[in-house]
């Protein structure tokens, strides 16, 4: 069960990395870094919370 949820988290993370990199294309480097950090926080934190919730079930 845990392994399955980790697999799905990994695949979701790779999809989100692709989305983040496509969002960041075309903006300046300084804005890039801020946007990437914001996007990473928005993506990773709910992902971790979901993973924790799934692991508890």
UniProtKB/Swiss-Prot annotation:
Keywords: Membrane, Transmembrane, Transmembrane helix. It is a single-pass membrane protein. Its main location: membrane. It is found in: Membrane. GO terms for cellular component: membrane. The chain crosses the membrane at residues 34-54. The keyword Transmembrane helix applies. This is Uncharacterized protein DDB_G0283507. It comes from Dictyostelium discoideum (Social amoeba).
